[in-house]
Amino acid sequence: MISPSSRKGMLKERAMDLVTQTTILPLLFGCLGIFSLFRLLQRTRSKAYLRNAVVVVTGATSGLGKECARVFHAAGAKVVLCGRNVKALEEFTRELADSSSSQGQTHQPCVVTFDLADPGAIAPAAAEILQCFGYVDILINNAGISYRGAISDTIVDVDRKVMEINYFGPVALTKALLPSMVERKRGHIVAISSIQGKISIPFRSAYAASKHATQAFFDCLRAEMKDSDIEVTVISPGYIHTNLSVNAVTADGSRYGALDKNTAQGRSAVEVAQDIFDAVGKKKKDVLLTDFLPTMAVYIRTLAPRLFFRIMASRARKERKSKNS
C-alpha cells in the first residue's frame, strides 16, 4: 500500500515531468531554433555582402595573403591581387582561374604590382587598383615583414624599414583609396595586425612597435569614418605557420632565414584566412585570433601589468640564455 507521503512525492514528480515536457523542452528547442535561424540569416547576409565585392589584398603572393585572396575569390568576390613579385601573382591568377569551374560563379582576378616599402609607388598603385573594377569595396592590408633581434644590437634603419612596410605603407594605401570610399559612402578597411599590436614580447621590438601603431591608427580611423559608413576591422592573429619568420629582418638588416618553433607550431594560414573572411562578412570591429594563453596575456597586461612585466623579463632571460648556449 502506498503511503500518503509517497503518493504525494509521485504526484510531485509527475507534475515536474509535465512541466518539463510542456514548458522547458519547447522553450529550449524554440531558443535553439531562433539561434539557428539567426546564424543562417547572418551567413546569408555575409555571403550577400561579399559576393561581387571588389576586394584588394596586399601581400597576395604567399602565406596568409594568398589564402585570404583564395577564400574571397571562391566566395564570388572580385579580387585585386597585390604584391611585389609579378610572376608569382600571375601564377596565382592562373591557379585561381583553374579552380573556378568547381566553385560556381567567380571573377577573373586583377593584378597590381608594387612595393609597399616605396613611398613613391603607393599613389600610382592606388590609381591602378581603382582602374581594375572602377572602385574598391574592401581593402585588406595584409602585407608585412617580421623582425628578430635585440634592441641594443639593432640599427635604426631596420626599425625604419619595418615601420615603412608594416605601418606607413598600409596607411598610405588606405589614405589613397579612402576618398573613393567616402564618395560612394561604402567601404570596408581591414588591417591585419598581430597579437603583438596589443602586447610586446622580447626581441620583437620593431615588429611590435609597427603593430601597436597599426592598431592605434585604424582604431582612430574607425571612429572618424563612422558617419561615412566606412567599416574598419582590425585582425590580431597569433602565430601562423607561414614563412613570416623565415623572411624576417634581423638586427643588422639581414634575413633571419629560419622557421622558429612558435611559428612552426602556429595555426594554418587556411584556417586563419577563413576566420578573417567570417569576421569581415560579419563586419566585426576588433578580432583576436589567438589561443588561450596569448589571449590571457592580453588581459594580464591590462589587469596585472607588474605580473606581465615579470613574465616578459623571464622570457627575455630564457631566450638570451638559449642564444648564448
Curated annotation (Swiss-Prot):
Lipid bilayer topology: Single-pass type II membrane protein
Gene3D superfamilies reported in the protein's UniProt record: NAD(P)-binding Rossmann-like Domain
Domain of life, per lineage: Eukaryota
EC number: 1.1.-.-
Binding residues annotated for NAD(+), in chain numbering: S62, L64, Y207, K211, T242
Secretion signal span: none
Active site: Y207
Cytoplasmic side: 1-17
Classification via InterPro entries: NAD(P)-bd_dom_sf, Sc_DH/Rdtase_CS, SDR_fam
Lumenal side: 39-325
Subcellular location: Endoplasmic reticulum membrane
GO CC annotation terms, alphabetical: endoplasmic reticulum membrane; membrane; nucleus; peroxisome; transcription regulator complex
Keyword NADP: yes
Molecular functions (GO terms): DNA-binding transcription factor binding; oxidoreductase activity; transcription corepressor activity
Keyword Endoplasmic reticulum: yes
GO terms for biological process, alphabetical: adipose tissue development; brown fat cell differentiation; ether lipid biosynthetic process; inflammatory response; neutrophil differentiation; phosphatidylcholine biosynthetic process; regulation of cold-induced thermogenesis; regulation of DNA-templated transcription
CDD domains (alphabetical): 11beta-HSD1_like_SDR_c
Binding-site list for substrate: S194
Ranges that cross the membrane: 18-38
Keywords: Endoplasmic reticulum, Membrane, NAD, NADP, Oxidoreductase, Signal-anchor, Transmembrane, Transmembrane helix
Family, similarity comment: Belongs to the short-chain dehydrogenases/reductases (SDR) family.
Annotated function: Putative oxidoreductase.
Protein name listed in UniProt: Dehydrogenase/reductase SDR family member 7B
Taxonomic source organism: Rattus norvegicus (Rat)
